[in-house]
Structure formats: structure tokens, C-alpha cells
């Protein structure tokens, strides 16, 4: 059995660079063997100071490198599908940043390819499942400590959006995390999505309606709502309140130092997702490595990637129509049950 994962990180942009640093400094049982980027200079800069790592310009070079036995995909989503097929052919353990692929049709093809392999090889990077507060709330739900879960209320707020962040990206790039969180908390599929567009902020760029209110329902009737507000200015905030038969649980509050000075009181707001979920990323990658070294794959699966893609498609349709849209899912293969 493999004692060390020799990982090819494909994509050396913001997320890829963060994972390269993580693998080379904080993760046990894994090493960076190769970094791939179309900008070879960026790949070379990313491996500086990492022993035995090579910079490459193509995923094929990395996958055929005899020193590589695992793959972490951090490229833009539209490039994932081809890399996933080739990594599955090698039977490598794969950690794929979300999305699995950009649409449900191609994601389903990846699910079928993995199913044909006969065992799971893909973990999808929904890192919130590994956050300590998310894990704690999940345990409360699973153990029925407060009775049955009835409703979920989510807030997802960003200080601003980069240039080119479209209306559809509020669903595909942001609410996608809540889609997975709701499925994680309830253990159920989301059956319908509705999007309501209210009064927009003046800070929203042209062509973007912000904020939006997303309403969802699960198989057992759990209702969930998401406030997505991506130009909130004040900082980054991801919070959830869960309503049970016998109580309420809230997670995601900023609980840093509370300061009183010079006639003022208060604390600091988390500036971005790296600060809020940095520890969760570490736990996520370590869990992937530990499972891969046992010959297993844990965490969010290719099915989870497919199901969230289907939710996103329903969400974008609901954005445009204003109607409640049914989430269309194929039958779940036995491999993921």
C-alpha cells in the first residue's frame, strides 16, 4: 500500500497555489510531485523550495509522470471533465475543486465513468463539510439532539465581486455551497428551487441583481432559504440557523476579540473565505490524503458534484423565470448509496 501520496496539482492559480502551500507545509502523508499550469513560469514559481517537484505545462505530462500517484484539480471548472477522465483511467485518487464540471450533463458522464471503474476515486472540494461548526451542527442533526430538523436559514455575504461576475454566478459560484450544505445537513436531495429578486443594492454592477433570496425544499419537506448578497461591502459572512422541534442552533458568527476603547465597542469582521474556512481546507485535504492512503475515498463524492450541478441548473432557470423549478436527477447509482 502507498505510504505517501505524490500529488500532481493541476492549476497554479489562487486555489492551486493555496493547496500547493498546504500540501508542502501542513499536510502529513502527501508531497507535491508536480505542478501544472498553462503559464509554465507560474508553475515554476509555485514549486520553488519544494524538493523533487517538477513544473509542467500539461495535465498529460503530469498524469504520465511515474512519480505521480494522486491528482488535485484546481483549474477553472470548464477544464475539469477531460482531466477527470484521464485521472480515472490511471485509477488515481482525485481531489477536484468544485464544480465537478460546469453542468449536470457532463457531471453525470463523470459519475458514469467512475461507476464503470467499480469504486470511488473522486472527492469534490466542498470544504464547508469539514468546518468545525458545520461538523458540530451536522452531528446535532444526525443524533436528533433537538428533535427533527424543520428549517434552515442561510446567509452568504461577500464584500464585493470581481469583474465579470454575472447574475448566474451568484448561483453557480456562490449558492452552490449552500446547495451542498443543505444536502449535507439533511442527508436528502433538494427537490425544488425558487429565486426571488427584490430591491437591488446600488453597489451591484450592471447586469447583476444583488441580493437574491433562494428558497428550497428537500425530499422530506425541510424548507431552506438562502440570502445571497455578494456586494455587501462590510466583509465576508457565511452563517446558518437551524430550526428544530426543540431548539435553534446558529453557526457562522464572528466570535473574535470584543474590544471597548475610546468611546467605541465591537470587533472585526472576517475579510474573506480564506480566513473563514482556512482550517476547513486543511482538514479537507488531510482527510482526502488519509483516505487515499487506505485505498478509499471519503467526503463529498462525484454524485454530490452531480447533484449540486443539477441544483445550480434549476437555480439559474428559477432566476430567469421567477417560478419554482423542480431539480431533475437521475437515479442514484449503488456505488454512492
Swiss-Prot record:
GO terms for molecular function: inositol 2-dehydrogenase (NAD+) activity; nucleotide binding. Its EC number is 1.1.1.18. GO terms for biological process: inositol catabolic process. It comes from the Bacteria. It is an enzyme of class 1 (oxidoreductase). It catalyses: myo-inositol + NAD(+) = scyllo-inosose + NADH + H(+). The keyword Repeat does not apply. Keywords: NAD, Oxidoreductase. SUPFAM superfamilies: Glyceraldehyde-3-phosphate dehydrogenase-like, C-terminal domain, NAD(P)-binding Rossmann-fold domains. The keyword Repeat does not apply. Involved in the oxidation of myo-inositol (MI) to 2-keto-myo-inositol (2KMI or 2-inosose). Homotetramer. This is Inositol 2-dehydrogenase 1. The gene is iolG1.
Amino acid at each position: 500500500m502507498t505510504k505517501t501520496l505524490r500529488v500532481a496539482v493541476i492549476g497554479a492559480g489562487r486555489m492551486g497555489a493555496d493547496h500547493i502551500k498546504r500540501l508542502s507545509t501542513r499536510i502529513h502523508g502527501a508531497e507535491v510531485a508536480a505542478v501544472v499550469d498553462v503559464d509554465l513560469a507560474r508553475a515554476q514559481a509555485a514549486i520553488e523550495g519544494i524538493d523533487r517537484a517538477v513544473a509542467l505545462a500539461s495535465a498529460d505530462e503530469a498524469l504520465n509522470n511515474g512519480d505521480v500517484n494522486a491528482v488535485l484539480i484546481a483549474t477553472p471548472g470548464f477544464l475539469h471533465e477531460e482531466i477527470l477522465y484521464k485521472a480515472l483511467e490511471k485509477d488515481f485518487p482525485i481531489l477536484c475543486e468544485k464544480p465537478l464540471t460546469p453542468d449536470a450533463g457532463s457531471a453525470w458522464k463523470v459519475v458514469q465513468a467512475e461507476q464503470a471503474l467499480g469504486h470511488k476515486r473522486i472527492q469534490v472540494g466542498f470544504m464547508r463539510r469539514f468546518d468545525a461548526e458545520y461538523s458540530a451542527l451536522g452531528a446535532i442533526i444526525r443524533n436528533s439532539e433537538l428533535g427533527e430538523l424543520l428549517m434552515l436559514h442561510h446567509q452568504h455575504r461577500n464584500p464585493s465581486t470581481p469583474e465579470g461576475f454575472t447574475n448566474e454566478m451568484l448561483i453557480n459560484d456562490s449558492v452552490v455551497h449552500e446547495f451542498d450544505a443543505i444536502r449535507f445537513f439533511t442527508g436528502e436531495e433538494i427537490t425544488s428551487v425558487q429565486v426571488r429578486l427584490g430591491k437591488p443594492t446600488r453597489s451591484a454592477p450592471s447586469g447583476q441583481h444583488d441580493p437574491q433570496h433562494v428558497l428550497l425544499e428537500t425530499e422530506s419537506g425541510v424548507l431552506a432559504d438562502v440570502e445571497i448578497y455578494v456586494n455587501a461591502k462590510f466583509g465576508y459572512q457565511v452563517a446558518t440557523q437551524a430550526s428544530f422541534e426543540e431548539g435553534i442552533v446558529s453557526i457562522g458568527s464572528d466570535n473574535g476579540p470584543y474590544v471597548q476603547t475610546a468611546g467605541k465597542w465591537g470587533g472585526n469582521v472576517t475579510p474573506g473565505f480564506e480566513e473563514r474556512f482556512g482550517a476547513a481546507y486543511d482538514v479537507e485535504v488531510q482527510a482526502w490524503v488519509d483516505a487515499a492512503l487506505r485505498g478509499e475515498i471519503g467526503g463529498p463524492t462525484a454524485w454530490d458534484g452531480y447533484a449540486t450541478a443539477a441544483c445550480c441548473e434549476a437555480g439559474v432557470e428559477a432566476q430567469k423565470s421567477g417560478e419554482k423549478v423542480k431539480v431533475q436527477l437521475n437515479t442514484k447509482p449503488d456505488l454512492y448509496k
